[in-house]
From Swiss-Prot:
Disulfides per UniProt: none
Similarity comment: family membership: Belongs to the glycosyltransferase 28 family. MurG subfamily.
Catalyzed reaction equations: di-trans,octa-cis-undecaprenyl diphospho-N-acetyl-alpha-D-muramoyl-L-alanyl-D-glutamyl-meso-2,6-diaminopimeloyl-D-alanyl-D-alanine + UDP-N-acetyl-alpha-D-glucosamine = di-trans,octa-cis-undecaprenyl diphospho-[N-acetyl-alpha-D-glucosaminyl-(1->4)]-N-acetyl-alpha-D-muramoyl-L-alanyl-D-glutamyl-meso-2,6-diaminopimeloyl-D-alanyl-D-alanine + UDP + H(+)
Domain of life: Bacteria
HAMAP family reported in the protein's UniProt record: MurG
The protein's role, per its UniProt record: Cell wall formation. Catalyzes the transfer of a GlcNAc subunit on undecaprenyl-pyrophosphoryl-MurNAc-pentapeptide (lipid intermediate I) to form undecaprenyl-pyrophosphoryl-MurNAc-(pentapeptide)GlcNAc (lipid intermediate II).
CDD domains: GT28_MurG (cd03785)
Organism lineage: Bacteria, Pseudomonadati, Pseudomonadota, Gammaproteobacteria, Pasteurellales
Binding site for UDP-N-acetyl-alpha-D-glucosamine: T13, G14, G15, N125, R161, S189, I241, A260, L261, T262, V263, C264, E265, Q285
GO biological process assignments: carbohydrate metabolic process; cell division; cell wall organization; lipid glycosylation; peptidoglycan biosynthetic process; regulation of cell shape
Annotated organism of origin: Haemophilus influenzae (strain PittEE)
Protein name per UniProt: UDP-N-acetylglucosamine--N-acetylmuramyl-(pentapeptide) pyrophosphoryl-undecaprenol N-acetylglucosamine transferase
Length: 351
C-alpha cells in the first residue's frame, strides 16, 4: 500500500519551524512520508535535513523595509514563487499540505489550492499573521494555538518538544528549594539586548538573593560578562542552552520574550514567568503573554517600562510559594497533545 505524504510549508524562524517538525515527526512514526518546502536562505535550510526530512526550495522573501523597487517587483516575485511551488507539488504529489507560517506559506498555499490538495493551517500566535489570514479563506481547516487568532478555529495549542512534558511537576521540583531565588534569563536564540543590558544592573542590586542562568545569544558572552563585573559568581552565562527543558525546570522564574513557542514551552513545563514582549506593531508577543498572565501564571513588563528598579521590585516581591502557584497555573494551560491533534486533522483531510 502506498504511503501517505505530507508537504510541510514553514520557515523563517524557530517559532514556525520547530512546531512543524514536531507534527512531521508524529506523522513519520505513523509511516507517513514528509517533504518540506522552504527557502534556501532561512533557518529551515540547515535545520530540517538534520531531522531526516527532505527539503525543497522556492524563491520568496519578505517585503518589510525593502523599498519601493521590491514593492513594485512583488507581484512578479509572488507569481514566480507560486509557479515554483506548483511544480514541486505536482512532482511530490502530497496527500495534504500543512502551513505553519513564514514567507513560503503564502505562494505554496495558493499553489496547493490550484493543485486541489487539502490545506491545513496552524496559527502559532495569539493574533493571526497576514499570510494565514489570507490563506484561511482557502484552507480546508484552520487550527490555532491560542483562542484569539481566529473566531471559529479549533484551539489545539502549539506542538512543542515532548521532553518538556516529561519534567517533574512544579510541586515536586519546588519541594526542597530553600536557597537563593533561581532566575533563568532567555532572549530567544538571538538573545535580547534589552535583557542582556538590564539583568546585570538587577543582579548588582540584589546579588545576595539570586542565582542566575543567562542565555545571552550568539557572540554576546564577553560583553555580558563585563556588564556583570564583580557579580559573575552568581551568574552562569551561555550563548545557547542545549537542554531547555532542564533549564526551565531548574528555574523558579523565567525572564524572557513572549514568542508563541516560548509561552507554550513555559506552560508545558509549568514555570512562572516575567514576559518582556518584543514591540511588534500588531502586539503579537503581548497578546501571546496574556494567555498566561490572564490566569495569574505570568507577569508582563512592557519593554518601554522595563528598568532595573522595576525588575528588582518584582523579584523581591516574589516568594517561592507565590512562584509555585504561578507555575502550577501555567501547567494547567498547557496542551500536551497539540502535535497529535494536528496530525489527526491532517489524516482526516487527506482521505
Amino acid at each position: 500500500m502506498k504511503k501517505k505524504k505530507l508537504l510541510v510549508m514553514a520557515g523563517g524562524t524557530g517559532g514556525h519551524v520547530f512546531p512543524a517538525i514536531a507534527v512531521a515527526q508524529t506523522l513519520q512514526k505513523q509511516e507517513w512520508d514528509i517533504c518540506w518546502l522552504g527557502t534556501k536562505d532561512r533557518m529551515e535550510a540547515q535545520l530540517v535535513p538534520k531531522y531526516d526530512i527532505p527539503i525543497r526550495f522556492i524563491q520568496i522573501s519578505g517585503l518589510r523595509g525593502k523599498g519601493i523597487k521590491a514593492l513594485f517587483n512583488a507581484p512578479f516575485a509572488i507569481f514566480r514563487a507560486v509557479l515554483q511551488a506548483k511544480k514541486i507539488i505536482q512532482e511530490e504529489k502530497p496527500d495534504a499540505v500543512l502551513g505553519m507560517g513564514g514567507y513560503v506559506s503564502g505562494p505554496a498555499g495558493v499553489a496547493a489550492k490550484l493543485c486541489g490538495v487539502p490545506i491545513i493551517l496552524h496559527e502559532q500566535n495569539a493574533i493571526a499573521g497576514l499570510t494565514n489570514k489570507l490563506l484561511g479563506k482557502i484552507a480546508s481547516c484552520v487550527l490555532q494555538a491560542f483562542p484569539t487568532a481566529f473566531s471559529n478555529a479549533e484551539v489545539v495549542g502549539n506542538p512543542v518538544r515532548e521532553d518538556l512534558f516529561e519534567m517533574p511537576n512544579p510541586d515536586i521540583r519546588f519541594s526542597d528549594r530553600e536557597e537563593k531565588l533561581r532566575v533563568l534569563v532567555v532572549g530567544g536564540s538571538q538573545g535580547a539586548r534589552v535583557l542582556n543590558h538590564t539583568l546585570p544592573k538587577v543582579v548588582a542590586q540584589i546579588a545576595d538573593k539570586l542565582e542566575v542562568r543567562h542565555q545571552v545569544g550568539k557572540g554576546a558572552v564577553e560583553e555580558v560578562r563585563q556588564l556583570y563585573g564583580e557579580n559573575l559568581e552568581q551568574v552562569k552565562i551561555t550563548e545557547f542552552i542545549d537542554n531547555m527543558a532542564e533549564a526551565y525546570a531548574w528555574a523558579d522564574v523565567v525572564i524572557c520574550r513572549s514568542g508563541a513557542l516560548t509561552v507554550c514551552e513555559i506552560a508545558a513545563v509549568g514555570a512562572a514567568a516575567i514576559f518582556v514582549p518584543f514591540q511588534h506593531k500588531d502586539r503579537q508577543q503581548y497578546l501571546n503573554a496574556k494567555y498566561l498572565s490572564d490566569v495569574g501564571a505570568a507577569k508582563i513588563i512592557e519593554q518601554a517600562d522595563l528598568t532595573p528598579e522595576i525588575l528588582v521590585n518584582s523579584l523581591k516581591n516574589f516568594t517561592r510559594e507565590n512562584l509555585l502557584q504561578m507555575a502550577l497555573k501555567a501547567k494547567t494551560m498547557s496542551m500536551p497533545n497539540a502535535a497529535q491533534r494536528v496530525a489527526e486533522v491532517i489524516k482526516q483531510y487527506s482521505n
